[in-house]
Swiss-Prot record:
PANTHER family hit by this protein: ABC TRANSPORTER I FAMILY MEMBER 1 (PTHR43499:SF1)
Gene Ontology molecular-function annotations: ABC-type heme transporter activity; ATP binding; ATP hydrolysis activity
PROSITE patterns per UniProt: ABC_TRANSPORTER_2 (PS50893), CCMA (PS51243)
Gene that this polypeptide is encoded by: ccmA
Annotated EC: 7.6.2.5
GO annotation, cellular component aspect: plasma membrane
UniProt similarity note: Belongs to the ABC transporter superfamily. CcmA exporter (TC 3.A.1.107) family.
Protein residues bound to ATP: G38, A39, N40, G41, I42, G43, K44, S45
UniProt xrefs under Pfam families: ABC_tran (PF00005)
Annotated membrane topology: Peripheral membrane protein
Superkingdom field: Bacteria
Protein name listed in UniProt: Cytochrome c biogenesis ATP-binding export protein CcmA
InterPro entries reported for this sequence: AAA+_ATPase, ABC_transporter-like_ATP-bd, ABC_transptr_haem_export_CcmA, P-loop_NTPase
Assembly description: The complex is composed of two ATP-binding proteins (CcmA) and two transmembrane proteins (CcmB).
Amino acid sequence: MQECGLVATDIACRRGDRILFRALSLDVKAGEIVHLAGANGIGKSSLIRILAGLLRPFAGTVERRGAIALSDERLALDGHLPLEDALRFWDRIDRAGRPEAEFGLDDLLDVPVRYLSTGQRKRAALARVAASGAPLWLLDEPLNGLDVHWSERAQEAIEAHCARGGAVVIASHQPLALERVRTLAIRNFQP
């Protein structure tokens, strides 16, 4: 697996006149899982978007090493296409494997994405990330909408990715059942 990781230094995020967090630093290396923890609205999603380079921090810097795959509230799969075709779009771009079976999607490949349930959509998004070949995964609330079985399977896939030399940053208000996880509480960086 290619080199991966990121270093965020003294990050601050502002929304309107409100500072969500400040002086947040984070160093993520290959093999690591970092849990960005906190209540809804505290700034976890904004931090994920800053780490991905989609949102400019109010202050601070982010250095990224290696390719990044992002899963957030935007599904990034064409809702009008059958799931198989929507996933193939990303396969053509990323030239990576197709982990549909790992996420229990084999029986859904002919179903248009717009007809998938919330949990099925979340599993499809995780399959897209896993198939990307990117060593660094940024996951915003990846377990939302998943039942206990698929939550466990998703966390197993995350641990397996890190065991192969990848790194994962997870923003979640839910507790995680991961063995090797470092938790960063966003509330510790509020003004």
